[in-house]
Amino acid sequence: YETAGTCGDTVNKSPHVPVTPEQIADSAIEAAKAGAAIVHCHVRDLDTGAQSRDPDLYKELTDRIRSSDTDVVLNLTGGTGADLTLGGIENPLPLSEEGTDMAGATERMRHVRECLPEIATIDMGTMNFGEGDYIMTNSTSQLDEIARQFQDLPVQPELECFDTGHLWYAKNQEERGLFEGKTMNAQLCMGVPWGAPDDMNTLMAMVNNVPLHWHKSAFSIGRRQLEYVAAAALVGANIRVGLEDNLYLSKGVKATNAQLVERATVILEGMNLNVMGPDEVRDMLAVSYTHLTLPTTPYV
């Protein structure tokens, strides 16, 4: 199956990156029409375009997608509230207010509880993410509490593993019963500085450590995104494309989410692979959709 990562942290780099809940929903729906069975969504601050965890924005986004006439599995990020930026090389404390947004487990899960997407992601560890003083921060105690909160919700977790240790910890959580009753589904996030590089040796190391009863997807970023459609398929993984991880269809040609999904579909069908639809994905991942309700007044 194909997941479309609709928007990340690149709002100023392409006119096609959606910002408002309406724009994100429209882009997600177009990606679904192009063949994505799952849409993975973040929301943005309406004034700055920066990533937001405002539950009202998530509610509007969710309602817009669910009130459309296009069927798609909704996957909301659970990665917000884990942003830590040190104060500088010589003075790491106090933390920099710009770029720091740390929240407790319950607050980080608030929009998931209120919107009840079919899937929500968990970033499975801490890492130096990109350059400078920024650290993606997920303590083991917080990850354990987030896993416990998933057990109370009709939402399946997607375990985003940016390195081998993240996958190791996800397996440890399952062994301790923290995901009891849940479908285990790993997203192997390759080539994100400074996690696991996206060479094939490292990909195979990740794939070979995913338990056989788990589902898995894999992606890379930038110009390697479309190459990884074929690479992921060859190692038995599902795929992800979209503007969260790559802005270009080809050199110098900026893409839309739908165009990236269309290109991925061409690659998969050229490999004689069938692309699954949303209902097939729901059945495979044991997604509960009996809880879904449409907004009383559809957005127009």
List each language-model region with its residue ranges:
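Single conserved hydrophobic/aromatic residue that forms the stacking wall/gate
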Residues: 291-300
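C-terminal helical cap(s) of enzyme catalytic domains, especially alpha/beta-barrels
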Residues: 251-268
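Mid-to-C-terminal alpha-helical segments outside catalytic/metal-binding sites
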Residues: 263-292
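Alpha-helix-loop-beta-strand connector modules within alpha/beta enzyme cores
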Residues: 51-76, 146, 150, 206-211, ...
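Catalytic alpha/beta core domains of metabolic enzymes, predominantly
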Residues: 119-242
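Glycine-rich, proline-tolerant flexible connector loops at the mouths of alpha/beta enzymes
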Residues: 38-58, 190, 248-249
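N-terminal small/glycine-rich loop or linker at the start of catalytic domains
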Residues: 1-16, 86-91, 121-129
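Flexible, glycine/charged-enriched surface loops at secondary-structure junctions
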Residues: 37-38, 72, 160, 271-280
